[in-house]
């Protein structure tokens, strides 16, 4: 029975082997070549098993993050009516980036790039008492934007996966408390992902409102320019600055030190919306015989963009290097030959009992040279590889290879799992 429950490379849909492969500069191309995603048309990608596993790991962390805020999961329709977008004033304002279509009755609608209109109209029919507040609802789903020039693979596509959180509070003070709570939850989430990030002040743009922050990974491939103070760590997006000045004149508003700039990839954002949408869609509650318009916030994390951003930030000369928190598999168990598959199964079972069966993959593809398996492991970027060979049969010794550092540990089978649990995972 256990044999059929093991995660086996022999039955997984993995990328096809490439005999001689030079790691490309583009992390997006590496994701394609290694079988994480496959391009369908410009800006549109199919997710293969490895890519879907990374996406699901990110979503698992997001569900935990949202539950920590007391948020409830919902699912809003991909199609959104022209009427509610006209009501908010964004039907024309959004312009050509909006995918517009007609049904057979000539009703106009769009593929939603965001859901402020729909969620506000929906929640306005549900919220009828101050006692229900605060309300926090979120969804993880696909969004659509008709990009003129899709680029960067998953970094800027025409179809993408987002986590959206929408919040409703009775007044501005309560909404500001919610805003700070969400920023803290985002900090915790990005720390769980495991890469250095920067939170910056940002412009509100087409969404509206008067307060916004963004979360970024520093990387040359990014489209944003962020400015940071080396003294007090104040950070802001370039949109918030007067760039008509020379770089030496751009100083920190807090301590007056000179700001330094870097390119970055935006992976998350927060907006305080105030009453922009709630006033238009009658999201109100009665307080002391008076209807009070609710204060809203919206908060997003780009799931598909995060996959690409992490790939770009961590990629090295040998391939991808996934943080263990979102890796498709945290541990790969590799026998040195087909003769050692049974021993590898023993190590797999013991390891899976400690770190979880969904975190371990057994490299049991037969008639495939050990060197090719190890090269695949480097390219795909499994955080930890356990090599099982003749020394395990003779002495119970395995080797653990840490992908991010290249460190190798030779350990007996009794201490193997203690090290994995205590130091690695």
UniProtKB/Swiss-Prot annotation:
One of its GO terms (molecular function) is ATP binding. It catalyses: tRNA(Pro) + L-proline + ATP = L-prolyl-tRNA(Pro) + AMP + diphosphate. The keyword Protein transport does not apply. It is an enzyme of class 6 (ligase). Keywords: Aminoacyl-tRNA synthetase, ATP-binding, Ligase, Mitochondrion, Nucleotide-binding, Protein biosynthesis, Transit peptide. PANTHER family: MITOCHONDRIAL RIBOSOME PROTEIN L39/PROLYL-TRNA LIGASE FAMILY MEMBER, PROLINE--TRNA LIGASE. GO terms for biological process: mitochondrial translation; prolyl-tRNA aminoacylation. The keyword Aminoacyl-tRNA synthetase applies. Its EC number is 6.1.1.15. One of its GO terms (cellular component) is mitochondrial matrix. It is found in: Mitochondrion. Belongs to the class-II aminoacyl-tRNA synthetase family. This is Probable proline--tRNA ligase, mitochondrial. It comes from Schizosaccharomyces pombe (strain 972 / ATCC 24843) (Fission yeast). SUPFAM superfamilies: Class II aaRS ABD-related (SSF52954), Class II aaRS and biotin synthetases (SSF55681).
């Amino acid at each position: 029975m256990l044999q059929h429950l093991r995660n086996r490379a022999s039955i997984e849909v993995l990328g096809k082997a490439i005999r001689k492969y030079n790691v490309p500069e583009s992390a997006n191309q590496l994701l394609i070549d290694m079988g994480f995603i496959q391009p369908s048309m410009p800006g549109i990608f199919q997710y293969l098993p490895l890519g879907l596993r990374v996406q699901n790991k990110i979503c698992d962390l997001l569900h935990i993050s949202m539950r920590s805020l007391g948020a409830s999961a919902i699912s809003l329709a991909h199609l959104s009516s022209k009427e509610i977008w006209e009501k908010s004033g964004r039907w024309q304002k959004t312009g050509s980036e909006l995918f517009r279509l007609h049904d057979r009755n000539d009703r106009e609608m769009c593929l939603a790039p965001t859901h402020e209109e729909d969620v506000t109209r929906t929640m306005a029919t549900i919220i009828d008492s101050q006692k229900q507040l605060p309300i926090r609802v979120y969804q993880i789903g696909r969004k659509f934007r008709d990009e003129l020039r899709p680029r960067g693979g998953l970094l800027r596509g025409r179809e993408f996966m987002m986590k959206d959180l929408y919040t409703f509070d009775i007044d501005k003070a309560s909404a500001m408390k919610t805003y700070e709570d969400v920023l803290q939850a985002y900090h915790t989430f990005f720390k769980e992902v495991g890469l250095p990030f920067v939170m910056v002040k940002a412009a509100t743009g087409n969404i509206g409102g008067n307060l916004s922050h963004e979360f970024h990974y520093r990387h040359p491939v990014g489209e944003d320019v962020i400015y940071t103070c080396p003294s007090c760590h104040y950070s802001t997006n370039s949109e918030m600055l007067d760039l008509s000045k020379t770089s030496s004149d751009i100083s920190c508003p807090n301590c007056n030190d000179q700001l330094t700039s870097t390119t970055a990839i935006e992976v998350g954002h927060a907006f305080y919306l105030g009453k922009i949408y709630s006033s238009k869609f009658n999201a109100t509650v009665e307080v002391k015989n008076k209807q009070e318009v609710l204060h809203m916030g919206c908060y997003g994390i780009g799931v598909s963009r995060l996959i690409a951003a992490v790939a770009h930030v961590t990629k090295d000369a040998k391939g991808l290097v996934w943080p263990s928190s979102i890796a498709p598999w945290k541990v790969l168990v590799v026998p040195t030959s087909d003769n050692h598959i049974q021993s590898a199964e023993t190590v797999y079972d013991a390891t899976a009992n400690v770190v979880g069966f969904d975190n371990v993959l057994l490299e049991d593809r037969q008639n495939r040279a050990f060197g090719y398996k190890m090269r695949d492991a480097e390219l795909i970027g499994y955080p930890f590889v356990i090599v099982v060979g003749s020394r395990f049969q003779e002495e119970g010794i395995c080797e653990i290879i840490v992908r991010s550092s290249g460190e190798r540990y030779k350990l007996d089978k009794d201490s193997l799992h203690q090290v994995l649990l205590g130091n690695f995972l």
